[in-house]
Amino acid sequence: MVPLLLLLAAPLLAADWTQFRGPNGSGVSDAKGLPDEFGPSKNAIWKTALPPGHSMPVFSETRIFLTAYDADGKLWTICLNREDGKVLWRREAPRPRNQELHKANSPASPSAVTDGRNAYVFFTDFGLLSYGPDGEERWRLPLGPFNNPFGMGASPVLAGDTLLQICDSESGSFFAAFHKDTGKLKWRVERPDVARGFSTPVLYQPNGGELQVIVPGSYRLVSYSVATGERIWWTSGLTWQLKPTPVMDRDRIYVLGWAGGSDTGQQEDIAPFEDVLKTWDANKDGALAKEEIPDPKIVKDWSSVDLDRNGVLGARDWQMFRDRRAAQNGLTAFRLGGKGDMTGKSVAWRYTKSLPNVPSPLLYDGVLYLVKEGGLFTSIDPATGEVLKQARLQGALDQYFASPVAAGGRVYVASQGGHVVVLKAGAQWEVLQVNSFDDEIHSTPVPLGNRLYIRTRSALYAFGTP
């Protein structure tokens, strides 16, 4: 990862952790000397009680920013002192609505991003806000409501003075750029051929070219100009719902996508809308009502097919249904760059077995890592897609929402059940320690400096060696 990171802007250096999963979403840190053994009563430097939230903490030189929600339904942005964990301020965000959420999601799932001084946050039930280092509100920008039955999950990203936010939903999807100091819109591009998604974008700086931002979404990967929002290149071949954030090396981007009904062998060839209308559209209104459809599977899954929720299936609904039934899950290695449609030209390899649902992949020291629910951990050769080792993480056979991270020759993996596994990194990885907490963990760990930060449902811990 390091060669690519050196091509990007200064805030993306591996010594920083300013956004979701740190430097360009990689999950890789240059931290060293972190303890293998830690827990509520071992190697804890400090612990700060917090309201719940799935977002991970992000860091400036002296401060920590995160989002949360409380039992009264209030949304919070919280700032802590990095040295001792003391809460410096907390600010309530407006909550004009309470949108539908998946049971595994939360009202405070997207992580904050910081430019080293100010914080920027996104909430499903409001939109974007920015706070100064002392908690003064700099600007606010209402967005939504969003037609996403699972709630939003993608985190904001900074590229220089540009704040980027992807908002993919069943309808009305868009990608927008704002000036970080004013919240003023720079550009907005509509994404009508995209349904719900949760993946945070990553930045790409080609040699001699303009800075780009790569967005995984339904069915395709798209690279946009950071300056203008223009589509520069794109490629098809993704599944219908993207949750993990991709990782990159100098030449390739590794995109993971798993969605229900799209494992290998589950694909179906669905007839075009025009053909279906001829036989099913009894009232000849150019749309399909539920009572006109003889297929019980479609009727049963109505809420997932009627994307705009208007009670009938139109041409877009049906095309998205066709695309969804043809989509295939996979971890795909795409060659970076190009111009225009790169479908059929950019795929280096594809792996379709034992795929995680939510956790992002990790690329560290020449090895790709995946962690799947049930504690199935896999190492893969990024050059070929060959599995190097696959085994269960004994002692942590749990559900996983947090993504793996790496530092100092170690990989850290946190389960929902409160187990944090420390592995010796490598093709033939080894479990060194399974640490246990008496609380759930949804947030991705942060190895930074000489400390390891773990957010549980009720607290943020800083661990280190005495």
Question: Positions of the model-derived regions?
Answer:
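Bacterial N-terminal signal peptides
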Residues: 1-11
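Noncatalytic, solvent-exposed loop/strand surfaces
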Residues: 14-466
